[in-house]
Regions:
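Active-site-adjacent loop/helix segments that line or gate small-molecule/cofactor pockets in enzymes
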Residues: 1-30
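Hydrophobic side chains within well-formed alpha-helices
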Residues: 4-7, 61, 87, 154
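Generic secondary-structure signature for well-ordered alpha-helical cores
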Residues: 12-20, 59, 66-74, 93, ...
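Active-site and channel-lining beta-strand-loop segments
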Residues: 23-44
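Short secondary-structure boundary/capping elements
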Residues: 26, 57, 83, 168-171
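Short beta-strand-to-turn element immediately C-terminal to the catalytic PLP-Schiff-base lysine
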Residues: 35-36, 54-56, 147-148
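Glycine-rich loop-to-alpha-helix module at the N-terminal edge of alpha/beta enzyme cores
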Residues: 41-126, 130
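PLP-dependent aspartate aminotransferase-fold enzymes
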Residues: 89-184
Length: 184
């Protein structure tokens, strides 16, 4: 058994298989390319599944991360930091002086959007709590974002799911319009 197979077998012993994985063990990257433990080179066209598209081993990014890690790696939002104040100021200006909340994942961002929509509805339009999402979408692994995900295979085993979600096919404006009501 080769090194790649050994690593995969070891991983399968302890990692919860909540999604399918490619049978390759990545070792390092440079720019848009990654190499597996066997030295095979691949074009990284996945971009961290929309988490980042920064490439690998960029000297400026590596330097900035190392500089920040030498100061603070992570602190709670219970504290102020200059970096957060500057980042939120820049983002706020780009969004016409809106407010910014930093989260850790897409699921957290989507969960926050669902909560913001529900809070707005609760405050200003109590009957408008229904949310429409697309079939074959994926919004995350929290219970609400899992429910918002328009794929029944992800719902199985997690019932009862939160209520208030409808689903429509992508690019079907008529179906979307038919789902819109006094509750959306």
């Amino acid at each position: 058994m080769g090194r790649q197979e050994e690593i995969i077998q070891k991983d399968m012993q302890s990692y919860l298989p909540v999604f399918s994985r490619y049978p390759m063990v990545l070792d390092h990257g440079n720019g848009a390319y990654v190499w597996d433990v066997n030295g095979r080179k691949y074009l990284d066209a996945l971009g961290g599944i929309a988490v980042n598209v920064l490439g690998h081993n960029n000297p400026d990014l590596v330097s900035a991360v190392a500089e920040q890690a030498a100061r603070l790696i992570h602190v709670s939002n219970l504290y102020y930091t200059e970096a957060q104040a500057e980042a939120s100021d820049k983002l706020s200006r780009l969004t016409r002086d809106g407010k910014v909340f930093f989260g850790n994942s897409g699921a957290e961002a989507n969960e926050g959007a669902i909560k913001a929509a529900r809070k707005y509805a609760h405050t200003f339009a109590p009957n408008k709590s229904q949310i429409i999402t697309a079939r074959n979408s994926f919004h995350g692994r929290t219970l609400a974002t899992l429910t918002a995900t328009g794929q029944k295979k992800f719902h199985k085993g997690f019932e009862p799911l939160p209520t208030g979600f409808d689903y429509v096919d992508f690019n079907d404006a008529a179906a979307l319009e038919s789902l819109m009501s006094d509750e959306t």
